[in-house]
């Protein structure tokens, strides 16, 4: 660090006075003499030249009071300069040389070694802003070993070059942070260690005052990063070991996990794949603690897009995902051999889809919340086909069933059974048109037998009930008949 006052000495360096004296005066005699340049000397002479002690004043305000030898300022003295600076100390050849102290008009000062009018060597500088430098100088600039202390608590101890911190040094900041390492052009650069009061510790490369290059960063919370940094942020390849036991190894950008990386959680979860802005995003593979494995697209740390999951029991799903849930179109294969191809919502069959069972049963139709709901076609293992409505997984509403033995029914259904009004055609050719209840003919209906006969009436438990016999009231007795 430099100070404006240190440069002033160059402008105020005393010059040796070459004074022509026409008549020599006895030594130690005090004489006042004025010169053509306006300067006035009052002091002793010897052999016609200033010698001993004297005061010399110039019209510009410069005043020197001190020792003279053979016409030259030499020895101890005090110089007051036009700019208000005051030097008191040793002189040689008209210039400060040796030990001396200069006090500047702004209150700053320097006390220490001088050479040929320049601040050179060891000394202490107090600056107007309250800062203090103790150490080596070269041509009025900090150069060599030195300590700079500021009123706010900032302290630097170490190497200087041409007025700037350069080499090895230690900085103590007002907040208690400490840097110990290399300096270049006044900034932290090279290798160094930074320790913050909250527990953060960084040790590694620095560029332009910022953490850059390879290093190790331990956060206050216990997380540890080892790898590349740029401009104070994690950038490039690195590894984070989190305080909770989790870890990440891979690429970073702008201090965030970005690019390709592997995350391992202490519970057994492992993800390997793409990252963006600190989150799992893109293509990747996740292995879960329960043994499930998902491979596909991710967004915001969750499966999102196209992907396939294989469960521990061997079941799989391959298709669309949204925010971590099975949603969209896909194929689910269960360990039992059941296969569903179709639409999903929140992890359940929902929309149009086809379910095939290993025994040959197939349902192709509408699903709601994992159940058959709406219109669909069910084909059974024995060749029976039902086409119609479903509710809560069972045949309900209007539907038609055709069985391999020739039975055919079209009409109402309830809770999986024929119920309501419909037409049933039996394998023998009989046709019943009427009401049903729980799979039985129940209520009004007509049976047309294959023989051509018909039976029309009320049915119960599948059979035609006998017609009710009318109750005839007894005829009243004739009038006038005696008992």
Predicted features by range, described:
Residues 1-11:
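Bacterial N-terminal signal peptides that target proteins for export
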Residues 10-20:
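Bacterial N-terminal signal peptides
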Residues 463-483:
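Compositionally biased, proline/threonine/alanine/serine-rich low-complexity intrinsically disordered stretches
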Residues 55-58, 65, 78-81, 88, ...:
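Short beta-strand elements of solenoid repeat domains
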Residues 40-51, 63-74, 87-97, 109-119, ...:
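Conserved anchor residues at repeat-unit boundaries in beta-strand-based tandem repeats, strongest
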Residues 22-27:
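Sec/Tat signal peptide C-region and signal peptidase I cleavage site
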Residues 30-44:
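An edge-strand/N-cap motif at the start of beta-rich repeat modules
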């Amino acid at each position: 660090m430099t100070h404006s006052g240190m440069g002033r000495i160059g402008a105020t360096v005393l010059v040796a006075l070459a004074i022509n004296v026409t008549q020599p005066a006895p030594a130690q005699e005090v004489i006042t003499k004025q010169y053509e340049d306006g300067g006035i000397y009052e002091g002793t002479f010897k052999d016609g030249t200033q010698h001993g002690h004297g005061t010399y004043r110039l019209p510009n305000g410069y005043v020197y009071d001190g020792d003279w030898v053979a016409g030259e300022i030499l020895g101890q003295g005090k110089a007051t300069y036009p700019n208000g600076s005051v030097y008191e100390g040793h002189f040689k050849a008209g210039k400060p040389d040796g030990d001396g102290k200069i006090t500047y008009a702004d209150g700053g000062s320097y006390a220490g070694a001088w050479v040929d009018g320049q601040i050179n060597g060891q000394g202490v500088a107090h600056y107007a802003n309250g800062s203090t430098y103790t150490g080596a100088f070269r041509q009025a600039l900090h150069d060599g070993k030195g300590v700079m202390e500021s009123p706010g608590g900032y302290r630097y101890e170490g190497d200087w070059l041409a007025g700037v911190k350069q080499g090895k040094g230690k900085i103590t900041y007002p907040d208690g942070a400490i840097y110990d390492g290399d300096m270049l052009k006044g900034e932290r650069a090279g290798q160094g260690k930074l320790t913050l009061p909250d527990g953060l510790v960084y040790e590694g490369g620095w560029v332009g005052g910022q953490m850059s290059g390879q290093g190790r960063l331990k956060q206050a919370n216990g997380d540890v990063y080892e790898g590349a940094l740029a401009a104070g942020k994690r950038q490039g390849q690195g590894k984070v070991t989190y305080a909770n036991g989790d870890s990440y190894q891979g690429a970073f950008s702008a201090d965030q996990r970005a690019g390709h990386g592997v995350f391992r959680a202490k519970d057994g979860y492992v993800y390997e794949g793409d990252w963006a802005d600190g989150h799992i995003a893109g293509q990747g593979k996740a292995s879960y603690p329960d043994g499930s494995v998902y491979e596909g697209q991710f967004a915001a740390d969750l499966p999102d897009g196209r992907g396939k999951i294989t469960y521990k029991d061997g079941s799989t799903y391959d298709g669309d995902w949204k925010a971590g849930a099975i949603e969209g179109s896909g194929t689910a294969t269960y360990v039992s051999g059941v296969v569903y191809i179709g639409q999903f919502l929140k992890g359940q069959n929902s929309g149009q889809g086809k379910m095939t069972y290993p025994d040959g049963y197939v349902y192709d139709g509408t699903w709601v919340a994992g159940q058959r709901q709406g219109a669909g076609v069910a084909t059974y293992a024995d060749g029976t086909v039902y086409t119609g409505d479903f509710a809560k997984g069972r045949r309900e509403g209007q539907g038609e069933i055709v069985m391999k033995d020739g039975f055919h029914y079209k009409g109402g259904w309830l809770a999986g059974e024929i119920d309501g009004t419909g037409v049933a055609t039996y394998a023998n050719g009989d046709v019943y048109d009427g009401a049903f209840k729980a799979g039985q003919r129940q209520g009004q209906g007509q049976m047309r037998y294959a023989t051509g006969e018909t039976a029309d009436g009320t049915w119960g438990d599948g059979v035609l009930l006998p017609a009710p016999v009318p109750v005839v009231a007894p005829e009243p007795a004739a009038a006038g008949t005696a008992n």
